[in-house]
Amino acid sequence: SNGDALYKFVQNSDLYWLTGIDQEDTMLVLFPDNTDEKYREILVLVRPNELKEKWDGHRLNVQEARQISGIETIVWLDSIDALLQVWIHNADNIYLDTNENDRKGFHSETREYRYIQEMKIRFPLHNYFRSAKISKELRAIKTPYEVEVIQQAIDITEKAFRRVAQFIKPGVYEYEIEAEIVYEFLRNRASGEGYSSIIASGDRARTLHYIYNNEICKDGELILMDFGARYGGYNDDL
């Protein structure tokens, strides 16, 4: 964003589902047919840097990454290109992850798109496939643990709803209602909103994706609310 402020980081959902790592510049390489068994499952992280950590906070070390992900082989991002050069010559097919959300926009090239194009230039004779199609099918079946996490997101959202049900009265602003919701999310250890909350009073309730939330709520008006907590990588939607 403007100046030296940063947009809040949100991890790729497939990567988080596979590794549990919630840190930027992370990659996962899976090569089950690698002749070197050590490099069949590789987690790629940014090398910890004392100066960068002073500004941006702690970065995972090898032991921490292993504990979170269950992956033994950890390599640093600045060395992955040289390793890929060796591994890829022993493979015929390359699967790359892409954001296949049906509502995704195409206004600008994403980092992942540029990386895919770079791979095709570096290794033009390989066969390329979509890993997102596979992960989408796998992620559709939730484990008991995932169900517990989703239920926690639901429970936090319910607490927020009950809070605002007691708070709402004529004369409050839509953004005050949103503030109560976010407060309840954060105090219950949610990472925040799953998406921008809609608090639409009066005529604004007819706007499907109204997100300004800056008008006063008047006596007798309907208030349309659409919000949900994000917890453990899962969003609720009320």
Which residue ranges define each predicted feature?
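Short catalytic-site patches enriched in acidic/histidine residues
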Residues: G3-F9, Q117, F129-E137, I141, ...
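A composition/biophysics-driven feature that prefers long, compositionally simple stretches
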Residues: S1-K159
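Short amphipathic alpha-helical leader/targeting segments
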Residues: N34, V164, Y234-N235
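Generic hydrophobic alpha-helical segments
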Residues: I80-L84, V164, I181
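Short, charged/polar low-complexity linear motifs in solvent-exposed/disordered segments
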Residues: T35, R59-V62, F167, Y175, ...
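C-terminal helix-coil-helix/basic helical segment that borders enzyme active sites and/or dimer interfaces
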Residues: R162-V172
